[in-house]
Design a protein with these regions (language model features):
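Mature extracytoplasmic or organellar-lumen-exposed domains after removal of signal/transit peptides
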Residues: 1-226
Length: 226
């Protein structure tokens, strides 16, 4: 919110926006495509199946595809300036709205790239740990790479000529309606998981309590990944 000359980390609004794009969006899509999906895929193709499975995030819970697609949702939320689902409209004070006002085609392609990465991941056969190779996995890796390339290239470039544009409203919307609610949700769901685990510890022979703890863990994963 206070990205200006008096801020030790972000000396301008556009500096903060660029950090969101590179350290946020691009790093996330690259990690999902090249590391979370790509590393196990490469090992599996090399015949190192056992090692490949251990490289899969959440392999023990079969929650990997949900985790990866939720990572892409986090990019969508940041770009749209609000927490929501794929296909939801962007807020008026958002990175998307700014880009659209300057280059509607780029905004449409960025939105399509986010949607494309999400849908490609969701199209992979589940559970990922048992289906580490194949055309759908390759498509997901490629879609994430396309999103990373577009973000680091044209999208980042769109802010090089921002001049003295005041990004305060966009950054405030991002902080208040994306970042803060996400951490609040994470805190609340982490507490619910803690309580569920306490109940399970007190009676670890109860299947209902095992199921409740599993459900609480999965619920807590959502804000963590998004």
């Amino acid at each position: 919110r206070t990205a200006d000359a008096g801020n030790a980390k972000f000396t301008s609004g556009v500096d903060a926006i660029r950090t969101i794009l590179v350290d946020g969006f691009a790093n996330i899509s690259n990690e999902v495509g090249s590391s979370k999906i790509g590393n196990p895929n490469t090992l599996a193709k090399d015949g190192k199946t056992a090692e490949a499975v251990l490289q899969v995030e959440s392999w023990y819970s079969w929650n990997s595809i949900t985790d990866y697609s939720d990572n892409i949702i986090s990019i969508k939320n940041g770009y749209a300036g609000r927490i929501g689902a794929i296909g939801d409209a962007a807020h008026a004070n958002s990175i998307s709205a700014y880009v659209k006002s300057r280059n509607a085609d780029l905004d449409a392609r960025m939105t399509a790239a986010i949607d494309g990465a999400y849908n490609a991941i969701k199209s992979m056969q589940s559970p990922f740990r048992n289906n580490l190779t194949g055309t759908k996995v390759d498509a997901a890796i490629e879609a994430c790479a396309d999103l990373t390339e577009l973000t680091e290239g044209e999208l980042l470039g769109a802010f090089r000529d921002a001049g003295d544009y005041d990004f305060t409203s966009i950054l405030t919307q991002y902080a208040d309606q994306v970042v803060t609610p996400t951490y609040k949700d994470m805190k609340e769901k982490a507490w619910m998981l803690y309580k569920a685990m306490q109940a399970l510890q007190a009676d670890n022979k109860s299947q209902a309590k095992v199921d409740a703890a599993c459900a609480a863990w999965r619920a807590m994963r959502v804000p963590w990944e998004q």
